[in-house]
């Protein structure tokens, strides 16, 4: 009887995790489909910005893809190039797993910078423009090359990310330019809260 109960518990946990990943995969496909007219999805030979300790985590599900513009346009250095953005999605099994990942990520954040939960920073050395959306058990990170940063385009990316990967209670962190500033722009945690410290 005990084995049967254990089996049912395991089966229920597996189905729950599968449903989570299925929903997330649908959101990823929806996000990619919305941008399909102007961006191609690349999944091979990806580099992108260093995400510090988050890259060492072992989430229940993760993916990394690059959206590359189909048409060339001019970047901040006057070069004709295909604009691109790297997107990484990490889904953890439980909220506790996500909180532990955040606790390890804050002292080793993007490009190995130290970030204090809920506190903005004027600079973030060597960090490229980035948007982080934390919602439920999912962390979604979008990074852009520094030479391609443009505030209006950045705001458009933020809107699209929060539409597909955010919600009313999601936390949003932005590196609004080359090397900062870092801003907690939505639902910043209380700096006194020890959950992510």
Regions found by a protein language model. Name each.
Residues 6-9, 17-86, 91-197:
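Soluble, non-membrane globular domain cores that form compact, hydrophobic packing
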């Amino acid at each position: 009887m005990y084995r049967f109960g254990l089996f049912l518990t395991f089966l229920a946990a597996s189905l729950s995790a599968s449903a989570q990943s299925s929903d997330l995969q649908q959101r990823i496909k929806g996000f990619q489909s919305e941008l399909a007219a102007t961006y191609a999805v690349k999944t091979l030979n990806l580099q992108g910005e260093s995400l510090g300790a988050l890259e060492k985590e072992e989430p229940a599900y993760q993916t990394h893809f690059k959206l590359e513009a189909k048409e060339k346009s001019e970047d901040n250095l006057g070069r004709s190039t295909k604009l691109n953005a790297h997107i990484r999605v990490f889904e953890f099994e439980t909220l506790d797993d996500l909180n532990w990942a955040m606790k390890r990520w804050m002292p080793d954040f993007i490009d190995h910078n130290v970030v204090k939960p809920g506190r903005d920073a004027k600079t973030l050395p060597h960090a490229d423009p980035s948007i982080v959306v934390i919602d439920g058990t999912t962390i979604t990170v979008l990074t852009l090359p520094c030479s391609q940063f443009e505030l209006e385009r950045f705001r458009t990316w933020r809107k699209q990310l929060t539409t597909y990967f955010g919600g009313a209670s999601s936390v949003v962190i932005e590196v609004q330019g080359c090397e900062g500033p870092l801003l907690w722009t939505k639902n910043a945690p209380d700096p006194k809260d020890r959950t992510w410290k």
